[in-house]
Regions:
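Catalytic-core signature of thiol
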Residues: 1-355
């Protein structure tokens, strides 16, 4: 019968999942600690005799593929969480009205000037994948990744910067209870810079703002921010061709929770609840995709990244990726206010990419 697995197979898969994702305890206790992973049958048949609820969903996706899906699901770090627990612990973006940015709608390179593909990881503008743990600070991780990117492009120096400083010190947002990337950019601008990850490390929860570090260590600075035109994937592509960009998505679905690899084209809405960073784009077998950096550690997705379908019929983009995008500005990389000089500077970067 579809959806059933032998007790020993379930046990082996569960033990492998525990080992990969750092879970501990005895087998029986672990079964009780992972109710979401097991069906109600475990109450009478025991953990090894139960059918993993998430595994049944994953199996259904795999067997029903038949060429319909371009992505795979697996037992991710969230396989022991119900959908409600997953949403509550890891999705912390809070959508708000968009205020005017210093550089308005920004500058861009148009049409045929855009490279067919770009990957800022390969160009030295993306730090390692981080882990927000059970803190809803995705918005801070998204903003910091974008700042790390533009700072690396402008200075030639890739430095891991501090999410914890923003979580602790940005009074406009709510730390691990949620926030918005644009507010994080504004905090860094007003603060005169941001500290390094090494000096102000992430602790996985809200902390007290360390004023000594906040005022004395301003390793990276930004001078403004740009809000990308909403509901326009071409505008987002133009922005990502210049630098890593903070984006918000709807990550509330089971398919996203269990994403393992491939180009994500699964079901999702546009109720934006998660901040991530678009660090590139490309195409595979005539399917366009965004390269998106997440903050759920390297064991989720494709080494911590997800490729999301690009150029979909809806103007919002897949999972709303084109609805609320923004990026930080450094005057040394973005001279002027969207003039021909700024576009020329952007073209220099693109020429380097295409060389």
């Amino acid at each position: 019968e579809f959806g059933t697995r032998a007790d020993e197979e379930v046990r082996r898969m569960y033990e492998a999942w525990k080992s990969k994702h750092g879970r501990g305890g005895t087998s029986n206790d672990d079964c009780d600690m992972a109710p979401a992973m097991m069906s109600r049958r475990r109450r009478t048949a025991g953990c090894a005799g139960g059918v993993p609820r998430h595994l049944r969903y994953i199996d259904a996706h795999t067997r029903g593929d038949a060429g319909l899906h371009t992505f795979r699901l697996g037992l991710t770090p969230f396989a022991d969480l119900t959908l409600e627990e997953y949403r509550g612990r890891f999705l912390g973006f809070r959508a708000r009205g968009r205020a005017a940015a210093r550089y308005g709608s920004g500058y861009s390179v148009r049409g045929g000037d855009l490279p067919d593909a770009i990957d800022w990881r390969q160009l030295g503008a993306v730090t390692e994948v981080k882990d927000q743990q059970q803190c809803g600070g995705c918005w801070a991780f998204s903003a910091v990744a974008a700042i790390e990117g533009v700072n690396a492009i402008a200075t030639g120096n890739l430095v891991s910067l501090s999410e914890q400083e923003i979580i602790d010190c940005d009074a406009q947002d709510s730390g691990c209870d949620g926030g918005q990337m644009e507010n994080a950019f504004r905090f860094v601008i007003g603060n005169g810079g941001i500290d390094t990850e090494a000096d102000y490390p992430f602790i996985g929860t809200d902390g007290t703002c360390d004023a000594s570090k906040e005022k004395n260590e301003k390793v990276a600075t930004i001078d403004g921010l740009v809000e990308v035109a909403s509901n326009n994937e071409t505008a987002l592509q133009e922005a990502v061709a210049i630098q890593p960009v903070s984006v918000a998505i709807d990550a509330s679905g089971r398919a996203f929770q269990h994403y393992s690899s491939g180009i994500f084209n699964g079901p999702c809405g546009t109720s934006l609840d998660h901040g991530v960073t678009a660090v590139g784009y490309g195409s595979e077998t005539a399917k366009d995709y965004w390269i998106v950096k997440n903050s759920w550690r390297p064991s989720w997705g494709e080494a911590g990244y997800i490729r999301m379908r690009r150029n979909v019929p809806r103007p919002t983009g897949k999972c709303g990726i084109a609805m609320d995008a923004s990026y930080p500005v450094k005057d040394t990389y973005h001279p002027g206010t969207g003039t021909a000089t700024a576009r020329a500077a952007a073209m220099d970067v693109i020429k380097m990419v295409l060389a």
